[in-house]
């Protein structure tokens, strides 16, 4: 009679490696997102034109919370003009071609900031700094997340 047997050695080590994979993945993704928002903030601050420095100082980030949400924002109560710098104030919004944000997504977002009092901000050209910084870093974020090893 011919017979053979098979077995797996190191199964306990393999189980241990997979047991904490979910936690390690969450940590890896959170770290990648946190580093990305810091990079986006730095890029946006470097890209924005400085007159008084108020807009540049208003560019801030918040790292991930328990829901995995992080953001970079520009503007505050005293710098309400940030979206007008980003998107301009002309009727025909002229946004740059981006890789990770479609033109329709850009336009939809930009339309939220249509100038309510055109006398105050008229015909300001588009001078993007935040969306272009996001676009630059988003692909790097995805690549970093994909690098995760179990």
Give residue ranges: language-model regions:
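Short, Lys/Arg-rich flexible segments
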Residues: 1-150
């Amino acid at each position: 009679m011919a017979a053979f047997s098979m077995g797996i050695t190191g199964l306990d080590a393999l189980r241990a490696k997979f047991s904490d994979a979910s936690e390690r993945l969450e940590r890896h993704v959170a770290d990648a997102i946190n580093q990305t928002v810091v990079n986006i903030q730095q890029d946006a601050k470097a890209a924005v034109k400085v007159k008084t420095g108020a807009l540049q100082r208003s560019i801030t980030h918040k790292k991930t919370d328990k829901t995995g949400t992080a953001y970079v924002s520009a503007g505050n109560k005293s710098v309400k003009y940030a979206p007008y710098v980003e998107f301009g104030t002309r009727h025909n919004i002229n946004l740059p071609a981006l890789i990770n944000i479609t033109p329709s997504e850009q336009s939809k977002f930009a339309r939220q900031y249509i100038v309510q009092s055109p006398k105050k901000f008229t015909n300001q050209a588009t001078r993007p700094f935040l969306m272009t910084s996001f676009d630059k870093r988003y692909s790097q974020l995805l690549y970093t997340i994909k690098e995760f090893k179990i």
